Amino acid sequence: MSEPMSERERWQLELDKLQRGLQGDPFAFLGPQRDADGEGGVLRAYLPGAQRVELLDEDGATLAELEQSDPGSGLFQHHLERLPARYRLRTHWPDGVQESEDPYAFGPLLGELDLYLFAEGNHRQLASCLGAQLTRHEGVDGVRFAVWAPNAVRVSVVGDFNGWDGRRHPMRRRYPSGVWELFIPRLGAGELYKYELQGHAGLLPLKADPLALACETPPGTASKTCAALRHEWRDQDWLARRAERQGYAAPLSIYEVHAGSWRHRDGRPPRWSELAEELIPYVRQLGFSHIELMPVMEHPFGGSWGYQPLGLFAPTARYGTPEDFAGFVDACHQAGIGVILDWVPAHFPTDAHGLGRFDGTALYEYEHPFEGFHQDWDTYIYNLGRSEVHGFMLASALHWLRTYHVDGLRVDAVASMLYRDYSRKEGEWLPNRHGGRENLEAIDFLHHLNQVVASETPGALVIAEESTAWPGVSRPVAEGGLGFSHKWNMGWMHDSLAYIGEDPLHRRYHHHQLTFGLLYAFSEHFILPISHDEVVHGKHSLLDKMPGDRWQKFANLRLYLSFMWSHPGKKLLFMGCEFGQWREWNHDGELDWYLLRYPEHQGVQDLVATLNRLYHELPALHARDGEALGFEWLIGDDQANSVYAWLRHAAGEPSLLAVHNFTPVPRQGYRIGVPQGGDWDVLLNSDAQAYAGSGAGSQGRVASEPAGAHGQAQSLLLELPPLGTLLLRPAG
């Protein structure tokens, strides 16, 4: 049997752990260590590089000087007959003197309920629990750090405040949660920090805080201490009416924006305050109801457009502070504009400072690459079957909805979440526990997400970008659906863009591409999306997709937008499409605003403003977007002339007639049946000179005739403009 270690041998062993960065239980050795009698004891501080350390009472009087155990060891200690209840350390460094309370004199920080809820995956306020929280603890101001790393041997907080030395601030492990915590007194806002983790296989790259509330401006990758948001909100009226404004019967017209490339200031991306000054009035002028921001969560690579985020709780520092972002959202609401954020729970990038192999193991991601690595995007896939990861992502969603008052989340890449074999060949994926291809863990998460959002942030939207035929995406969970409020209609987008890209001479052979979408238009609560994805990577801008010469391109664009706005479904249009930008979108530049000097571009912009005005003013265009009763075909079979016509209905409101001519041939005397006799007003002619069109087609008022057509007793004899749309309703 070996001899028991002497006291010196024991602390030499502990010192060796500290010096080698292997001390996983610093509170058992550092700070006040009481003698067996409970009165006196040893007070230890490990401060490598310090020259002297004085022990002060709470009033600042010197009680003793701590002795360095061995010269240069960095371990300072002193035995006292009575350990003080409160004390401070005055540390003499080569470049100055620092006075502060001892981090290792404080008791545990997080409560058992917090740790239980986190482990359960149901801590709804995780953003105020883990991460770096400015707080007052045991009467002392400072920052409480907490991070989940259950498989780490040791975790330390490092930053400018300790010279990025991982030996200075090792953290306390809380069993069994795997959370590490430490309170650093007198630390404030604006400090850069990361976590240094010792894994079982050695030291890991410094990690940013997964729950950081603010981050360093890229290309820097550090987290930043940040006070809890103290914005004085003035959007109470908006929030009180939000559920009504965002209901299925309300008009929803979304302007999709990449904040950094909408409009530059002095050759640089804008700040949130500048966007509030310029973007909000612009959106109001054009009549959009909402702004959808491409991801503003902190992301290391600007070229990902935000779709590879690592700071799931922090607005990117590229455009300002968290307070600046809150001010932007508040200003939108006061102007009557909703804010939707793109949010990415499907995958995350492999940057060394990020979530991947966070504690030396596959913590946030699946272990097996067939489950945990996305080959198309070179990213990791969240293991949403792990309760802590499930709860982390749920808390992120709630953080944006509650803390920043955003009105909805557009969930990116839902299809990749639903299927284990998404974009994988045979033999490159693992089946679920039933042998199927569905990702049951992700489905459970989406169910939970949508139920919690509906319960805790009533009226908020959760929109799915989902490109497959998965049934019931926007059906309530209780009815067997995924529970989203809306789904992007990717099928409509692909078919309609393919059709409009055809030469008008050939469109008769593709007539079904516009009629097919109306077979399933009411199976979900759809949004018609013309998003950023359609104007990049060689796909051409929306204007440049149009066939023909310059005149035909603009006429086709005006026709396409008019077709879209009169079609069932809410609307989404990416910035630049509203005035017909020629070039593809470039995230490093700004939109080509100079084009608005030309009448054709100004005409497209004016048309979009008119379409939004009509869409909001006329219930027939929005009140029954998701109901078959709100739509009635009149002409869906005029393949020879590429003409389509339908009625839109709303209860107790006049019907609206939409007629589209997809050829450059004016159609004189084109008869269309209508449900009501008398005069009909032409509300819109997309070829009107007001929109830089040719001025052809019916204008003003048209009288009906008692000649039956298309199953209606009355009809109108119209002049259809070339490559144009007419919108009409009964006069009066």
Curated annotation (Swiss-Prot):
GO terms for biological process: glycogen biosynthetic process. It is an enzyme of class 2 (transferase). GO terms for cellular component: cytosol. CDD domains: AmyAc_Glg_BE, E_set_GBE_prok_N. Pathway: Glycan biosynthesis; glycogen biosynthesis. InterPro entries: A-amylase/branching_C (IPR006048), Branching_enzy (IPR037439), GlgB (IPR006407), GlgB_N (IPR054169), GlgB_N_E_set_prok (IPR044143), Glyco_hydro_13_cat_dom (IPR006047), Glyco_hydro_13_N (IPR004193), Glyco_hydro_b (IPR013780). One of its GO terms (molecular function) is 1,4-alpha-glucan branching enzyme activity. Coiled coil: none annotated. Keywords: Carbohydrate metabolism, Glycogen biosynthesis, Glycogen metabolism, Glycosyltransferase, Transferase. It comes from the Bacteria. Its EC number is 2.4.1.18. The active site is at D412, E465. It catalyses: Transfers a segment of a (1->4)-alpha-D-glucan chain to a primary hydroxy group in a similar glucan chain. Belongs to the glycosyl hydrolase 13 family. GlgB subfamily. PANTHER family: 1,4-ALPHA-GLUCAN-BRANCHING ENZYME. NCBIfam families: branching_enzym, PRK05402.1, PRK12313.1. Catalyzes the formation of the alpha-1,6-glucosidic linkages in glycogen by scission of a 1,4-alpha-linked oligosaccharide from growing alpha-1,4-glucan chains and the subsequent attachment of the oligosaccharide to the alpha-1,6 position. Monomer. This is 1,4-alpha-glucan branching enzyme GlgB. It comes from Pseudomonas paraeruginosa (strain DSM 24068 / PA7) (Pseudomonas aeruginosa (strain PA7)). The gene is glgB.
